[in-house]
């Protein structure tokens, strides 16, 4: 994968997250902000999830209250380089815990 393809795929990931949060109809207030390649999700309780792209490594990084995760694209899924879990699974687990209610991005 070259840099432009990586950015296209990361942009697509950011857009999906932003669209899902725009459509969010849960009880919790969840905000999303994108600034310079960093996507920050802020929850009503003040906690945050931060997602950023690491261009030199062609990775997406996810920082949550539970820890930090690094994802490589394998096929059509972003996969954690330590646990083998998908980006969406880990994001949903963290968002659900931090929101205090079920959050789905799929």
Swiss-Prot record:
Gene3D superfamilies in the cross-refs: Frataxin/CyaY (3.30.920.10)
Pfam families: Frataxin_Cyay
Superkingdom assignment: Bacteria
Record flagged with keyword Metal-binding: yes
Knockout mutant characteristics: Cells are not affected in cellular iron content and sensitivity to oxidants.
GO molecular function: ferric iron binding; ferrous iron binding
Transmembrane segments: none
UniProt keyword Oxidoreductase present: no
Keywords: Iron, Metal-binding
GO annotation (BP), single: iron-sulfur cluster assembly
Family per similarity comment: Belongs to the frataxin family.
Assembly, per entry: Monomer. Forms homodimers and higher oligomers in the presence of iron. Interacts with IscS.
Name the UniProt record assigns to this protein: Iron-sulfur cluster assembly protein CyaY
């Amino acid at each position: 994968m070259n840099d432009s393809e990586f950015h296209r795929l990361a942009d697509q990931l950011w857009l999906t997250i932003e669209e899902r949060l725009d459509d969010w109809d849960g009880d919790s207030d969840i905000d999303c902000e994108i600034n310079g390649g960093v996507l920050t999700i802020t929850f009503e309780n003040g906690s945050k999830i931060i997602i950023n792209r690491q261009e030199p490594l062609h990775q997406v990084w996810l920082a949550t209250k539970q820890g930090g995760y690094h994802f490589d694209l394998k096929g059509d899924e972003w996969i954690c380089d330590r646990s083998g879990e998908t980006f969406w699974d880990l994001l949903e687990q963290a968002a659900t815990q931090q929101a205090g209610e079920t959050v789905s991005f799929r």
